[in-house]
Amino acid sequence: MPAVKVLEELGLLPSHARWLSAQAGNFLGGTKPRNLIEEMELLRDVLSEYWNQIAQRVEKPGNPVRVLVGPPGTGKTTALCKWMTQESLVNRKPVRVWRLDGDRGNTAEFLSLHGELMQIPVDRFWDDNDQPPEDTMRFVDLPGVAPNNPDALEALARGLADMPPLEIQLVLNASYDLGLLLRQVRAFSHLPLAGILLTHIDEAERWSKVWNVMLATQLPVSFLSGGQDIPGDFHRAIPENLFDAFVNAGLQTTSPAAG
């Protein structure tokens, strides 16, 4: 299918392109697209439906505690500040945050200062007996854990196992090389991850990286964050919009390397 070849030239990994071609054939149901535009529309539908299937598979019911984990320096705390600000100011939801220590101390003082500014409680210790009303958005900030530190990763898993139902978002820097991102996901794959939150999206050179990460890890990219301003650029990832951005931005470049 010519449209699949175009996506591969725009950065989709060859293995993903082959998978997409097969999926499109099954999705087609005997109706052959008449031109490249219709082929692109078909691929958009195939990828978006698959994305939503993955998201539904890992979705946590109810109102779980949202936990942000990831390597040091990926922008977890900034992303959390954006998220909690939007929930509080835009969505008018009650919010409470826990800034917890891990295998090392959590030095993100900025989170506590931002919480004070927003009049959002930021606690330093978790207490099962001190929980807010059920409609409260609960967030947990933890220190970054190096992917090459198995002891720290295991300690992280043990600490999270003692908490109530969680929605664990893995925070990664979208400007990093695709190979590094996939290695980082593998390092945290022992956790029941609910999705990936990509930061520094404004520095990412290619939107193909978002699709390659999703297809390689079988995890939805839940949120996208760009810049340092708060609340700034922080939004839920919509697959249809990301496909359009992938194609529109990719057609303006000429480099065929995957990323």
Task: Locate predicted features.
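Primarily NTPase-proximal linker/entry elements flanking Walker-type ATP/GTP-binding cores
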Residues: 1-95, 99-108, 113-133, 137
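NTP-binding/hydrolysis catalytic cores, primarily Walker-type P-loop NTPases
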Residues: 3, 7, 214-259
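Conserved beta-strand/loop subsegment of P-loop NTPase cores
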Residues: 19, 94-96, 165-172, 189-231
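Short, solvent-exposed amphipathic alpha-helical segments in soluble enzyme
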Residues: 83, 112-116, 185-189, 211-216, ...
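Inter-motif core of Ras-like GTPase G domains
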Residues: 93, 136-137, 150-176
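Conserved nucleotide-binding/hydrolysis micro-motifs of P-loop NTPases
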Residues: 102-105, 144-147, 174-178, 201-205, ...
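Conserved P-loop NTPase "ATPase switch" module shared by AAA+ and STAND
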Residues: 135-147
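Conserved ATPase-coupling elements of RecA-like P-loop NTPase cores
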Residues: 147-156, 179-183, 206-209
